């Protein structure tokens, strides 16, 4: 993995002073006239026609105000994209849907998997996937509030770093867990004889630990640098959407490209290979497994459709496009990132509720809960009537 080599860059240390050193506010004073003129010229400038051979910033490129480093100035075009109806209406609507649907769906699925289903290797993987989707629904409300309030973050710097890392951590953790599920199903269906020796709780536990630790390692750099800045000329405290140009150009470009490649493209490639071999094995049996073929194709399509667009836009954002495309690419990336979270609502229905046995267990469990609550309510009503009779007798 290339992340250990990138940590010095992400912490702000430079490997090549000529390329990565963060410029000071003013150049050193030289003895020549050119040096004297250069010493009075700020090196941190906001120029929409910036040379395309320089790395692009993460998010919208912001220019720190001369008298306040906590405030960023944005070009008018970037500010219009940042405050438009897509990030302030569409994105919070998507996040709200994820919370409303994903929280009960994944919570119920996790409950059934943990209490009513035999602890098989596939069950452990699906439980971890349900936990990841459930955690997303729990950490999304702050970002929902942020977008609904017109890009105003009220929870402080630490909460912004945690919320940003959690959002990206869910994305890449989910992709890694989905890749582990595809490997498990490949072993079970294509190598069914060997699977008895390979598929065990030990291998499953290792796969889950690798997925969680890899996701945490990939998003850890997001907690190293400041993420909240005040938008110049307004009361909007931005969270991760606009960052200083000079502080981001040296390390965020390799960091986020590595994040997209290792956290998304490589696991998705593994899923395509595993599910491709699984589909061939199922299709060889004709109509006998037609339902399994359709379901496997749906699982693969949903994962690719959910995670590919946002990560492709992320890579394009760092591939030195024309200066006019910087804001447009990030403006498209924000809703595509929100759309990727919809996968947490889809997972329960294509992995759990599609199974007739699973639905029966859910139905039986809900019926027992309803009967228990009805009997408890009836006993309380009977007790209250008895208390009323005793009270009237005493009177």
Curated annotation (Swiss-Prot):
Signal sequence bounds: 1-16
Main subcellular location: membrane
Residues the UniProt record annotates as site (Cleavage): 58-59
Region described as Disordered: spans on this chain: 46-66
Keyword Glycoprotein: yes
Membrane topology: Multi-pass membrane protein
A GO molecular-function descriptor: protease binding
Glycosylation sites: 67
Subcellular localization(s) per the UniProt record: Cell membrane
Stretches with biased composition (Basic and acidic residues): 47-56
CDD domains given in the database record: 7tmA_PAR4
GO annotations of cellular component type: plasma membrane
S-S bridge residues: 160-239
Ranges facing Extracellular side: 59-93, 141-161, 225-254, 317-330
Chain residues in the propeptide: 17-58
Stated family: Belongs to the G-protein coupled receptor 1 family.
Function field: Receptor for activated thrombin or trypsin coupled to G proteins that stimulate phosphoinositide hydrolysis. May play a role in platelets activation.
This protein's name: Proteinase-activated receptor 4
Organism annotation: Rattus norvegicus
């Amino acid at each position: 993995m290339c992340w250990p080599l990138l940590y010095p860059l992400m912490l702000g240390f430079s490997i090549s002073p000529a390329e990565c050193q963060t410029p000071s506010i003013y150049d050193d004073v030289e003895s020549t006239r050119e040096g004297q003129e250069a010493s009075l010229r700020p090196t941190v400038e906001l120029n929409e026609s910036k040379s395309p051979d320089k790395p692009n910033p993460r998010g919208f490129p912001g220019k720190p105000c001369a008298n306040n480093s906590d405030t960023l100035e944005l070009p008018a075009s970037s500010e219009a994209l940042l405050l438009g109806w897509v990030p302030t209406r569409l994105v919070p609507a998507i996040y709200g849907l994820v919370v409303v649907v994903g929280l009960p769906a994944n919570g119920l699925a996790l409950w059934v998997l943990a209490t009513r289903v035999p602890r098989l290797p596939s069950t452990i993987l699906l439980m971890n996937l349900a936990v990841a989707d459930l955690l997303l629904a729990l950490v999304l409300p702050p970002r929902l509030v942020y977008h609904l309030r017109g890009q105003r973050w009220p929870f402080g710097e630490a909460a912004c770093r945690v919320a940003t890392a959690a959002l990206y951590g869910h994305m890449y953790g989910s992709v890694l867990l989905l890749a582990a599920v595809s490997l498990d199903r490949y072993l079970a269906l294509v190598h069914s004889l060997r699977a008895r020796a390979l598929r065990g709780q030990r291998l499953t536990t290792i796969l889950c630990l690798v997925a969680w630790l890899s996701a945490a390692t990939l998003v850890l750099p997001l907690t190293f640098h400041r993420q909240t800045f005040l938008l110049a000329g307004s009361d909007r405290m931005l969270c991760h959407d606009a960052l200083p140009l000079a502080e981001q150009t040296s390390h965020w470009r390799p960091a986020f490209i590595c994040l997209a490649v290792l956290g998304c493209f490589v696991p998705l490639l593994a899923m395509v290979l595993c599910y491709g071999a699984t589909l061939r094995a199922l299709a060889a049996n004709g109509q006998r497994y037609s339902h399994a073929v359709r379901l496997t194709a749906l699982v693969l399509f949903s994962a690719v459709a959910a995670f590919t667009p946002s990560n492709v836009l992320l890579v394009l954002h760092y591939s030195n496009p024309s200066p006019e495309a910087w804001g447009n690419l990030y403006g498209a990336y924000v809703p595509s990132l929100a759309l990727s979270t919809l996968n947490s609502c889809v997972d329960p229905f294509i992995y759990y509720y599609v199974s007739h046995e699973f639905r029966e267990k859910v139905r039986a469990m809900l019926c027992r809960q309803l009967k228990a609550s009805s009997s408890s309510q009836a006993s309380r009503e009977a007790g209250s009537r008895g208390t009323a009779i005793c009270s009237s007798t005493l009177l």
